[in-house]
């Protein structure tokens, strides 16, 4: 029996040897010992929020959609919102699988990335389920990023950010390479999921607040819960990489990130103006200027940068839904406050 035992104890993982990136000497297949407890907490919280769109009845939404009780402007907001989200979730999922996962060398962080990729698939399924339920032209909705200029501009911007990281020869073992990787993380976690998506949530949840399209609203609430964890994981990942590789956090990189976020804010304002040429449900396109700038400042602060807009939140009810002021940055507080989906009240 003794001959069956291999002399491999030296390959057991040392916790202090683990790093988020550029750590190929540590066996990424060994989950334990867990070093980055924040990554594992995000994974557990994601699993606690498990849901599927088909669990949510759409009968009242179908009845309302087929009636004359929605204005053309209200229908426009819903259709353009679905047009953006239907492919945006796929872009995020593809970026996780094809760009981020291979360059993250920590198993607990990878564990969460796998969970997140599944959730992006569920979200894409959600938009198909909504289209099927309402009898919408699915091809038109899912092709909106080729037919609507404001949606295409946002998605093209995202693809610019991920282009270099998708190159098969891309590496993160240089300062420049790791800086490019961090910009990718900013583009998808901070901008796409933390700015573009939150603006879209306001539009649809405004219907839900007035007891309209309540099935869609409930699904967006579940997506918002998921995306809040995605955002927090992304921020912790960015800050963790900064902490382990302080040489990358140069004034030049910081300014590049600020400029990316400024561009994103401008693009989101243009999209809001396309969605809302006239006011509905107490929403006006001008309100989204303040809101997008407000949440952009909050995202900048959470990765250690100064706010640039200093605008107030015109939608305080969104802060009541997911209180941005109480989101805890792991690297500032070492505390993560989440509630399981089953215990959340709306």
Curated annotation (Swiss-Prot):
CDD domains in the record: RNRR2 (cd01049)
Binding sites annotated in the UniProt record for Fe cation 2: 120, 193, 227, 230
Top-level taxon of the source organism: Bacteria
Reaction(s) the record says it catalyses: a 2'-deoxyribonucleoside 5'-diphosphate + [thioredoxin]-disulfide + H2O = a ribonucleoside 5'-diphosphate + [thioredoxin]-dithiol
SUPFAM superfamilies: Ferritin-like
Keyword Iron recorded: yes
E.C. code: 1.17.4.1
UniProt keyword annotations, A-Z: Deoxyribonucleotide synthesis, Iron, Metal-binding, Oxidoreductase
Positions of Fe cation 1 binding: 89, 120, 123
Cofactor binding: number and manner: Binds 2 iron ions per subunit.
Disulphide bridges, residue numbers: none
Cofactor: Fe cation
The family this protein is said to belong to: Belongs to the ribonucleoside diphosphate reductase small chain family.
UniProt protein name: Ribonucleoside-diphosphate reductase subunit beta
Native species: Chlamydia trachomatis serovar D (strain ATCC VR-885 / DSM 19411 / UW-3/Cx)
